[in-house]
């Protein structure tokens, strides 16, 4: 939607009054970030969240001339914990690959109707 917002407002001053912009559910590519920064200097919040949780379990805040962090999903949102675990559900050391697990009140307890 950030892409659509920027495209719809191209060549206008419609976005000039924005103080904060939140986007999530899409990859913040270097090109999209550059388009945003070339148009606005406002604070940009980029959120990450898996479908099993919510639109945002973590976020990155880009203020002023902050550079885009290529591989970061940011810090956990309040009341949320994020863990990288191995196949045996044990935490892995920093820099070691694993599966991302989220915990906290934003996480659903399961499906209303479990998939078949």
Model-identified regions with their sequence ranges:
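Activation segment
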Residues: 5-6, 32, 93, 111
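Conserved AMP-binding
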Residues: 1, 51, 104
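Gly/Ser/Thr-rich phosphate-binding loop
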Residues: 6-68, 81
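Short beta-turn/strand-loop junction motif enriched in small, turn-promoting residues
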Residues: 2, 10, 87-90
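AMP-dependent adenylate-forming
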Residues: 42-46, 61-116
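Alpha-helix capping/helix-boundary segments
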Residues: 1-2, 28, 107
